[in-house]
Amino acid sequence: MATEPKKAAAQNSPEDEGLLIVKIEEEEFIHGQDTCLQRSELLKQELCRQLFRQFCYQDSPGPREALSRLRELCCQWLKPEIHTKEQILELLVLEQFLTILPGDLQAWVHEHYPESGEEAVTILEDLERGTDEAVLQVQAHEHGQEIFQKKVSPPGPALNVKLQPVETKAHFDSSEPQLLWDCDNESENSRSMPKLEIFEKIESQRIISGRISGYISEASGESQDICKSAGRVKRQWEKESGESQRLSSAQDEGFGKILTHKNTVRGEIISHDGCERRLNLNSNEFTHQKSCKHGTCDQSFKWNSDFINHQIIYAGEKNHQYGKSFKSPKLAKHAAVFSGDKTHQCNECGKAFRHSSKLARHQRIHTGERCYECNECGKSFAESSDLTRHRRIHTGERPFGCKECGRAFNLNSHLIRHQRIHTREKPYECSECGKTFRVSSHLIRHFRIHTGEKPYECSECGRAFSQSSNLSQHQRIHMRENLLM
């Protein structure tokens, strides 16, 4: 008698598939919530770190108060009551690693919220691989000669610096146009300038025309070395009448006339006439008084680098017509970085990602790789954040406390779910009847009333139920029958 219902239930494969889809969607939704919460925690951690590093002695009334405040800020950042010694060590190593990176690379890595030094290295390696094929060309501005390799022989001391796009066989680490100093020296006692090396760094895999790194040394009678900051992007400076210099863009029409700076060399601050921007050479940062505005679409940007990126996207495939920095096929690949194309695709399920590090993390789902192991019980996890949450089971730690009732939780998502009891918030609404719920799982359970889905089946008689609690209650009937027999 019991075999016939089992055969009938086995034929309901569409229902089983529907159940599987519902479970997968529920897991993806919960995973998405955990990802947002994790990113929020990383942002909070970074804020605490900056408060600790930027604390000044003048902010406290005395030395004892200063020490106490520093200790408090350090605990807020490293959270020794939550993190293990290994995790605290990893945070310190990661901070120092980001500190020694150039400023542009720091910004790029920070945007991806790395949790460990290994993740930061993976992000940088991904960035290098994506920009290895950029081909650049430098042309002499006045003589029309193409200059390859990394040296220039200037004719005189009045510095007349010109910027041109370059195409060279040398290997570069960025998709940014290479910049070359073209120095004119008119002094009789001048000697040939030293070799000038062309370097470039990357800011969020963007073409940086607005951020200037390094220090500019003045020429006073005799030629001096004007390339003092090795490993940084060199920018074009044009000295007019011995009073001002002008910084211009490498591609007038492709990028638009973005930057035409009239600079004062005497001070540390350089002002921009068009948008009243101010550049601090020492801090390598722009402090805007106004936003740069794109003339075609009227969109404004706070940072010049964002403005340039917008110009690139807006120009699209037209960029290759105005300069020799990129040829058409390479331009398409280069522009894909800014357009948000997901070029890294999973061979198993076809899901695409923008960065190879995210793809590598995703592929652990298919391979079953679990590289993070618990020292207490030996259980392994695919994500470091999962291991951190698991360790709280052993430590009994519940760092997330409710301010209303004092109840504590080991996960922030559980605290958020609990707080809806106090706020009476019900964000999950049924599209069929409009009924709302505090938890997404309650909405999924309720939705089975409308769909008629009964995913929980009794192994004894084949009867199906919409809720697992009803199945458990039903199975007690069979248990009693077995005891009586």
From Swiss-Prot:
SUPFAM superfamilies: beta-beta-alpha zinc fingers, Retrovirus capsid dimerization domain-like. Residues 62-127 form the SCAN box domain. There is a cross-link at K23, K162, K195 (Glycyl lysine isopeptide (Lys-Gly) (interchain with G-Cter in SUMO2)). InterPro entries: SCAN_dom, SCAN_sf, Znf_C2H2_sf, Znf_C2H2_type. Its main location: nucleus. Keywords: DNA-binding, Isopeptide bond, Metal-binding, Nucleus, Repeat, Transcription, Transcription regulation, Ubl conjugation, Zinc, Zinc-finger. It comes from the Eukaryota. GO terms for biological process: regulation of transcription by RNA polymerase II. One of its GO terms (molecular function) is RNA polymerase II cis-regulatory region sequence-specific DNA binding. One of its GO terms (cellular component) is nucleus. It is found in: Nucleus. The keyword Ubl conjugation applies. Expressed specifically in testis. A zinc finger (C2H2-type) spans 290-314, 344-366, 372-394, 400-422, 428-450, 456-478. May be involved in transcriptional regulation. Belongs to the krueppel C2H2-type zinc-finger protein family. This is Zinc finger protein 165. The lineage of its organism: Eukaryota, Metazoa, Chordata, Craniata, Vertebrata.
